[in-house]
Curated annotation (Swiss-Prot):
Superkingdom field: Archaea
Role noted for this protein: Required for the formation of a threonylcarbamoyl group on adenosine at position 37 (t(6)A37) in tRNAs that read codons beginning with adenine. Probably catalyzes the conversion of L-threonine, HCO(3)(-)/CO(2) and ATP to give threonylcarbamoyl-AMP (TC-AMP) as the acyladenylate intermediate, with the release of diphosphate. Shows ATP hydrolysis activity in vitro, producing AMP.
Pfam families (UniProt xref): Sua5_C (PF03481), Sua5_yciO_yrdC (PF01300)
Reactions the enzyme catalyzes: L-threonine + hydrogencarbonate + ATP = L-threonylcarbamoyladenylate + diphosphate + H2O
Gene3D superfamilies recorded: DHBP synthase, Threonylcarbamoyl-AMP synthase, C-terminal domain
Recorded coiled-coil stretches: none
Designated name of the protein: Threonylcarbamoyl-AMP synthase
Keyword flag Lipid metabolism: no
GO cellular component: cytoplasm
């Protein structure tokens, strides 16, 4: 039986937080909000507790977890050999949506790191998350609080749909702020390597680190062979409805015209294009002028698509600047790499 606890995200009630913290300390699982998406947490020092996360999510065990901390003392409990520059940067950017991959200490069990000698760590910028970690007295390992392959949850209702009856506690702390998962960067190598784009942008990373490596899998153009961090290797973020991603905006209208003749479609578009496609089902992602709004609505939109009873979702591409890079990473993966750059690409993915 899952206990659902509603907590004020701005002024978390300590008595309610303590209920969830007791569950963490006793080897249980708690879904909780962060500034990015909801996470499903367990004691990061308890391998058996962390296995419950994988079981609840149907998550492959070779897909590592992010360890969430509330202070720098906890950082040194889970990570070692941290470069001075990385420590300086962490003091600037934390709490915030940036995860570092570092060398792990012996205290971190293999269940958290998928047997690797590295650990992904971040300090979340959310009052409920920070208070939960503090009251638990241990770092909390947590991936997103959804069934594996499904869109990450940005509100408690989505967590309840996926995980009610599968976890001990779900904290309802309202809608998350960013709507996409944290940026992950591997700082055990030089230059650092971007493993997953997120709210902390490439432009911001370059200001802090100088040169960074951006592999193809970080762009969402292919899967990584080994998962050093979440979101690298497996199908992610996907609605159950087939999703096509039209990266070339110049042909979007033609693609929609072609597909809507044979299929029942829903369009995932910015509000600026809404009038142009009147008469077709639409999910408005936000405004072209505010990509943070688009990111915040992205996973909600994928879940909304599944409620519309259509054959296909057709999503338009967005500029890969700022958080747009993370939007396109998630969209490519959600589409199963069904990416349309020319009209001829349509025939690769759909029978016309």
């Amino acid at each position: 039986m899952t206990q659902i606890i509603k907590i004020d995200p701005l002024n978390p009630e300590i008595d309610k937080i303590k209920i969830a913290a007791d569950v963490i300390r006793n080897g249980g699982t708690v879904a909780f909000p962060t500034e990015t998406v909801y996470g499903l947490g367990a004691n990061a020092f308890d391998g058996n507790a962390c296995l419950k996360i994988f079981q609840a999510k149907n998550r492959p065990v070779d897909n590592p977890l992010i360890v969430h901390i509330a202070d720098f003392n906890q950082l040194f409990e889970v990570a070692k050999d941290i470069p001075d520059k990385v420590l300086e940067i962490a003091q600037i950017v934390w709490p915030g949506p940036l995860t570092f991959v570092l060398k792990k200490t012996e205290r971190v069990p293999k269940e958290v790191t998928a047997g690797l000698d590295t650990v992904a760590v971040r300090m979340p910028a959310h009052p409920i998350a920070l208070q939960l970690i503090r009251e638990s007295g241990v770092p909390i390992a947590a991936p997103s609080a959804n069934l594996a392959t499904r869109p990450s949850p940005t509100k408690a209702e989505d967590v309840i749909v996926d995980l009610n009856g599968r976890v001990d506690v779900i904290i309802d702390g309202g809608h998350t702020f960013f709507g996409v998962e944290s940026t992950i960067i591997n700082v055990t190598v030089e230059p650092p390597v971007l493993l997953r784009p997120g709210p902390f942008t490439i432009e911001e990373l370059k200001k802090l680190f100088g040169e960074i490596v951006i592999p193809e899998f970080a762009q969402g153009k292919k899967e990584a062979e080994i998962a050093l961090a979440p979101g690298m290797k497996y199908k992610h973020y996907a609605p159950n409805t087939r999703l096509l991603l039209v990266e070339n905006r110049n042909i979007f209208k033609d693609v929609v015209s072609l597909l809507s003749k044979k299929y029942k479609v829903a369009l995932l578009i910015p509000k600026e294009l809404s009038k142009e496609f009147e008469g077709l089902q639409q999910i408005i992602l936000g405004s072209d002028e505010n990509l943070y709004e688009v990111a915040r609505n992205l996973f909600d939109s994928f879940r909304e698509l599944d409620k519309l009873n259509v054959d296909l979702g057709i999503m338009i591409g967005f500029p890969e600047r700022g958080i747009g890079f993370a939007i396109m990473n998630r969209a490519r993966k959600a589409s199963g790499f069904s990416i349309i750059k020319a009209i001829s690409d349509v025939y690769k993915y759909v029978n016309i």
